[in-house]
Amino acid sequence: MRAAVESGAVDMPQEGFRKTYFHWIENLYDWCISRQIWFGHRIPVWYREQEVYCGVTPPEGDGWEQDPDVLDTWFSSALWTFSTLGWPEDTKDLETFHPTSFMSPAYEILQLWVSRMILMSGFHLGQVPFKKVMIHGLVRAKDGRKFSKSLNNGVDPLEMIEKYGADALRMGLIVGAVIGSDIRFDEQKVKAYKLFANKVWNIARFVLSQERTGDIKTELKEEFDALAKEVTADMENYRVYMAAEKLYHYLWGRFAAEILEESKGKPEYGKTLYYILENSLKLLHPFMPFITEEIWNSMPGKKELLMVEEWPIK
């Protein structure tokens, strides 16, 4: 478990969480793996008077009684990366998709799940379960407390989606969410991104009403391409909150408020507007997949899904 992270086989770049991980390994304690709950893997142990049998299949003969307990949830979950791919059979999926490329759990299950996946995968396959792990924080209530049934402060995401749309909820959770840090859920923030979704829709309506005329204006193209490079770099370095916020400010404060206003009555802007819109949809798609896909489907000559289009920056 230590060697997998120390060697870099599992890249855990957040130093604070690396220290937490190693501290736990250096201070291991016994783990009771049996649980008295309704669902789970049955413990493969049978008893008959003073006899005890452990095996994959039930023992032969009469009078055997299987242990009534099940394995701890985290014991079973630790097998996830390979058990879902057909293990213990040597399947094509297991060969192709294991180890997983990237894992992003919350910090509260770093020991419960991440460390135990590394343990189980190493024991059973001699492999790491994933190549990189980035730890994220928790979504808390507006006052900073954990969501809790006893506090009755939970938020039903389906209600938020019904009220504001899935894209607005996604943006409300992404912007401001520094990786590894907790965020406070604020419904007003989600509401604000519903207004942004409306703005994106109106931007598209205006651009699609224009003819694709004129030459692409070099200055505006270079400005947008510079933004696209910044957004791409942010995403590659897991600063997704910064990437989303930059797109928000550009589309609303620059493209809609300035460039579109300047272009009104000027057909020579046509190709430039289409260039910016098309590539903005590509950049925004990971954050707001539904509205961007819908707009893309309305654009002339677009047959493939937006999600399989080439990224603007190679």
Which residue ranges define each predicted feature?
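C-terminal low-complexity, glycine/proline- and small-hydrophobic-enriched intrinsically disordered tails
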Residues: 191, 300-314
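Structured secondary-structure scaffolds
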Residues: 1-212, 220-264, 271-285
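Aromatic/acidic polysaccharide-binding cleft in carbohydrate-active enzymes
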Residues: 297
